[in-house]
Regions:
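Hydrophobic alpha-helical membrane-insertion signals
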Residues: 7-34
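Short, glycine/acidic-enriched loop or turn micro-motifs at the edges of active sites
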Residues: 24-26, 51, 174, 204
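Extended hydrophobic/aromatic segments used for targeting, binding, or gating
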Residues: 217, 258-263, 267-273
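C-terminal soluble interaction/assembly domains
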Residues: 233-235, 253
Length: 273
């Protein structure tokens, strides 16, 4: 089970669980770290998406995965060990805890030890649960990663799939962006979408009132209506962040599915040459 409820977390805060705040805001003046400093769930450790992404010079607005050694260094500095139970939350409309979840799985943390707080900080605060601004004490550790390279697709693999049609590609962006009706928010990226891809906005899997995932039955119906019924499914978006939301959603209805993401996403594929 990928999700943990606010009630479950509230009753297990004293357990040997590493709590991570993965808040990040897309093209915004808001700072996830500054907001974390002002308020967070007790003992939460901040995860910086920008610092834990591999920025390529020709694609500065994308979020490629970090190098294995950099991931090990970052998690060791955060005091996380391979045997730790991880619960991730965020205060982001984009549900960036899902991207953090994906990175943990990609770098080999056991799936049964990585969870997302359903509803994140928004739901936690709506229920008047305890928050703090106290600094979390961290004892550095030694983390060892192992890459699951089958969990990502490259641009070349996406192009080959247009001909071979070996998997379905779902795009988590809004329909307006997918159909090219609006300008892309990132500079140097054209409007539109990848040939033969299917649009399922990540927001259609989320309850906007409290940022929790919709009922499994509703999510299942959404995927089935698009012909997604097996593990040959890959997710994409603008920069491989919200694609992870669909990865989580699909894992809720298919416990044999390990998320696969086109890591370059549209900001790579749609780059204006």
């Amino acid at each position: 089970m990928t999700l943990v409820s606010t009630h479950e977390l509230d009753n297990s805060l004293s357990d040997n669980t590493k709590l991570i705040d993965a808040s990040w805001h897309f093209l915004s003046n808001r700072s996830g770290f500054e907001e974390y400093q002002k308020e967070h769930i007790e003992n939460a450790i901040f995860f910086d998406l920008e610092k834990n992404s591999n920025k390529q010079k020709n694609l500065p607005h994308n979020h490629f995965l970090p190098e294995k050694k950099d991931w090990e260094k970052a998690l060791s500095k955060m005091g996380i060990s391979n045997s730790d139970k991880i619960v991730i939350y965020d205060n982001s409309d984009l549900i960036t805890s899902c991207r953090c979840w994906f990175q943990f799985l990609y770098f080999g943390h056991r799936p049964n030890l990585v969870f997302i707080l359903d509803g994140g900080l928004k739901k936690w605060k709506l229920e008047n649960k305890k928050i703090t601004n106290k600094e979390t004490k961290i004892k550095p550790s030694k983390y060892f990663a192992k890459e699951n390279t089958h969990m990502i697709k490259t641009k070349l693999q996406i192009e080959e799939n247009i001909k071979k049609k070996e998997f379905k590609l779902l795009d988590a962006r809004s329909k307006e962006r997918f159909y090219g009706n609006v300008k892309e928010p990132r500079p140097g990226v054209r409007s539109g979408s990848i040939e033969d891809s299917i649009c399922l906005p990540y927001s259609e899997c989320i309850n906007p009132k409290d940022n929790s995932f919709l009922d499994k039955k509703i999510i299942d119906e959404k995927f089935k209506s698009l012909g997604v019924i097996d593990n040959n499914t890959v997710f994409s978006c603008g920069s491989s962040v919200t694609a992870s939301v669909l990865g989580v959603a699909y894992s809720l209805i298919n416990n044999k599915y390990m998320p696969i993401i086109y890591i370059g996403s549209w900001s790579e594929y749609g780059k204006i040459k």
